[in-house]
C-alpha cells in the first residue's frame, strides 16, 4: 500500500494532532487560531488508525506555549502538540489539564460580575470521576466543561 500525506508538511509553526473528530473547529474558534494572520491548515474527520477519525490543525509561524497547549487538554486530552522548526519537531508538549484557565471562556452565570466589570474570566479546573468541572473565580459557581465552552 502506498502511503500518501493528506496534509502538506509544515516548515515552521505548531501541529495539533489527534484531536477528537468534531473538536477541531471548536479549538480554532476558542483559541482564536485563525486570527494570527498566518496560514492555518485544518483537517477534519481524517482517517486515524488509533482513533478511527480525528481532526488536525497546523498553524504556520506560531509556536504554542506550554500553557496554551495545556488549555487544549480541556477539549483534546490525548492530542499531541508539536512545535516545528525547519520541518523538524523541536518540542513536544505533554498535555496536562491546567489548574486554571484565564480569558478564554465567558461565565455561563448571567449574574456573574465578570460580565459587567473589566476583568478577564478565570475558571479553576477540576476533574471528578472523569468529568471536568470548571469553577468561576468570581461567582464561584461550578459548571461542566461543555457548558462553559458553549457560552463563549
From Swiss-Prot:
* UniProt signal peptide: none
Cofactor needs: Zn(2+)
Cofactor: how bound: Binds 1 zinc ion per subunit.
Annotated keywords: Metal-binding, Pyrimidine biosynthesis, Zinc
Name any one GO molecular function: metal ion binding
GO BP, sorted A to Z:
'de novo' pyrimidine nucleobase biosynthetic process; pyrimidine nucleotide biosynthetic process
* Entry binding sites for Zn(2+): 107, 112, 136, 139
What cellular-component terms does GO give this entry? aspartate carbamoyltransferase complex
Which SUPFAM superfamilies does the entry link to? Aspartate carbamoyltransferase, Regulatory-chain, C-terminal domain (SSF57825), Aspartate carbamoyltransferase, Regulatory-chain, N-terminal domain (SSF54893)
Question: Which InterPro entries does the UniProt record give?
Answer: Asp_carbamoyltransf_reg_N, Asp_carbamoylTrfase_reg, Asp_carbamoyltrfase_reg_C, Asp_carbatrfase_reg_C_sf, Asp_carbatrfase_reg_N_sf
Superkingdom assignment: Bacteria
Question: What family is it from?
Answer: Belongs to the PyrI family.
Role according to the record: Involved in allosteric regulation of aspartate carbamoyltransferase.
The cross-references to PANTHER family, in alphabetical order and at most eight, read:
ASPARTATE CARBAMOYLTRANSFERASE REGULATORY CHAIN
Assembly with partners or alone: Contains catalytic and regulatory chains.
Q: What is this protein called?
A: Aspartate carbamoyltransferase regulatory chain
Look up and give the organism this protein is from: Chromobacterium violaceum (strain ATCC 12472 / DSM 30191 / JCM 1249 / CCUG 213 / NBRC 12614 / NCIMB 9131 / NCTC 9757 / MK)
